[in-house]
């Protein structure tokens, strides 16, 4: 059994079923009880976590995908999915499509994107939402602001010294997109 909370990957052993309940023994942590409830998976409340219900991911991930890939694809689809129109910036008037698998089309200079969800990239963006945009494997961090149907993408300006961890602050606006 494996899962991630965005900060660490947690592994454990799935132990036998007792009256419809599976026990997951996480190494270095307490155990959790899992039980199917119709189409949902129910995690019983424990010492460190409340009761949680999980649905099967509607967007399948390829075999061998990293931990968290189902969540990431569902988030990308719900938050970024659909058609966007560039209302200001390079490519004005073009339609942009953000895909659940991290592909992007129609945004000049980018063929892939990734939202910063946790870890170092989150700590480097000073509380701002950030994303990675790249083309042909080369890319940069960007700050973004989502307000309803508007998505503003700003340059990420590094205010750290060369020997420090980057600290990104919002710079000039590169694009303004509107969800269609």
Named regions from a protein language model:
Residues 15, 56-58, 68-70, 124-126:
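N-terminal start-of-chain detector that recognizes signal peptides
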Residues 42-63, 83-85:
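Short beta-strand edge/turn micro-motifs at domain boundaries
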Residues 1-40, 88-95, 104-179:
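Contiguous, well-ordered beta-strand patches that form the walls/edges
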Residues 1, 59-68:
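Low-complexity, repetitive regions of proteins mediating host interaction that are extracellular
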Residues 64-85:
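N-terminal helix-cap/turn-to-beta initiation motif at the start of protein domains
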């Amino acid at each position: 059994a494996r899962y991630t909370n965005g900060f660490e990957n947690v592994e454990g052993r799935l132990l036998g079923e007792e009256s419809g309940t599976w026990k997951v023994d996480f190494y270095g942590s307490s155990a959790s009880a899992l039980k199917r409830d119709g189409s949902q998976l129910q995690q019983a409340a424990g010492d460190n976590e409340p009761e949680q219900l999980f649905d099967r991911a509607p967007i399948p991930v390829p075999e061998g995908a990293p931990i968290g890939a189902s969540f990431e694809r569902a988030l990308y689809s719900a938050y970024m999915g659909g058609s966007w129109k560039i209302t200001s910036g390079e490519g004005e008037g073009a339609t942009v499509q953000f895909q659940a698998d991290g592909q992007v089309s129609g945004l000049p200079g980018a063929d892939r994107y990734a939202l910063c969800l946790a870890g170092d990239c989150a700590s480097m963006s000073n509380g701002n939402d950030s994303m990675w945009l790249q083309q042909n494997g080369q890319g940069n961090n960007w700050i973004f602001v989502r307000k309803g149907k508007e998505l503003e993408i700003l340059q990420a300006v590094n205010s750290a010294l060369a020997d420090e961890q980057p600290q990104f602050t919002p710079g000039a606006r590169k694009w303004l997109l509107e969800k269609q």
